[in-house]
From Swiss-Prot:
It is an enzyme of class 2 (transferase). Keywords: ATP-binding, DNA replication, Early protein, Kinase, Nucleotide-binding, Transferase, Viral DNA replication. DGMP binds at residues 44, 65, 130, 137-138, 150, 170, 172, 176, 210. GO terms for molecular function: deoxynucleoside-phosphate kinase activity, ATP as phosphate donor. Allows the synthesis of deoxyribonucleoside triphosphates necessary for the rapid viral DNA replication. Phosphorylates all four dNMPs. The enzyme had the highest activity with dAMP and had about 30% less activity with dTMP and dGMP, respectively. The lowest activity was observed with dCMP as the substrate (about 35% of that with dAMP). Belongs to the dNMP kinase family. One of its GO terms (biological process) is viral DNA genome replication. ATP binds at residues 14, 16-17. Changing residue 130 to K: Complete loss of enzyme activity. It holds the Pfam family DNMK. This is Deoxynucleoside-5'-monophosphate kinase.
Length: 250
């Protein structure tokens, strides 16, 4: 039976590391098992990175993710963003050329837009990578396009791959929890794990809706990250997988 494993938790709680360890467990325990890692935010990272003219990896670097910095937005970058829009089928819900000016005026102007005089440069934007990701994911995608846009894209991706184990690293919104536990159309068993840091000093606080949590009724398990070394975390994750995941996969 195929299994959908969702990970929930505050920013900085270690969800990505836990996801990697679950995939490692799958490879170690069931070498022929097809296990894949997924993220609701993958198209968000791709869109935000081309808009800002950087790589998705740059936006994901924790050391600079919270720091406001200057980015130059160019016409060619917006054209590439439109290509990403088409790549993920977002144009089936809203046209990029219609939605972008609304988003730009309502949400980017407050982030200190300064007009550029350089050729092809439209303006400079002073913003942190995390804030840009939040705006693209929630205000642009969920509010201006469709509340379920990132869920729809992820469901299509999982259905296409047809993995034995799909690990979703970033379950943040109530309808994402609902997708895993109540309304998924993928014919997969599901677990939703809350990754909890033993000490709150490791997490990153935010009042953005994407960090407000999901209803407890969707959470099936809790895994405590003590931040006491990768080997200890591996033991915790492997023990969890032996007890909870193996009966569903085996």
């Amino acid at each position: 039976m195929s299994v959908l494993v969702g990970l929930h938790g505050e920013a900085g709680s270690g969800k990505d590391t836990v996801a990697k360890l679950i995939i490692d467990w799958c490879n170690d325990t069931y070498p022929t098992c097809l296990s894949r890692r997924y993220s609701f935010a993958k198209p968000v990272y791709e869109l935000a990175s081309v808009i800002l003219g950087v790589t998705p990896e740059f936006l994901g670097e924790r050391r600079g993710k919270e720091i406001d910095q200057w980015f130059t937005v160019t016409q060619s970058q917006l054209e590439r963003a439109r290509d990403v829009w088409f790549k993920y089928g977002i144009d089936k819900f809203e046209d990029f050329s219609y939605v972008w000016p609304i988003f730009e005026e309502k949400y980017l102007n407050p982030q200190q837009l300064i007009s550029e005089n350089k050729e092809d440069g439209l303006y400079s934007l002073f913003i942190s990578p995390r804030k840009m990701l939040q705006l693209v994911g929630t205000e642009l995608g969920r509010q201006l396009v469709h509340e379920r846009i990132w869920l729809i894209i992820l469901e299509q991706s999982i259905a296409k791959d047809d993995p034995d184990v799909a690990v979703i690293t970033d379950v943040r919104f109530p309808n994402e929890g609902e997708l895993l536990r109540e309304t998924n159309h993928l014919d997969m068993d599901s677990l939703l794990v809350n990754v909890v840091p033993a000490e709150q000093k490791f997490t990153i606080k935010s009042d953005h809706p994407s960090e407000s949590g999901i209803p407890a009724k969707y959470i099936t398990h809790e895994l405590v990250n003590k931040f006491d070394g990768i080997n200890n975390l591996k033991l915790e994750v492997y023990n969890f997988c032996d007890l909870e995941l193996e009966p569903l996969v085996g």
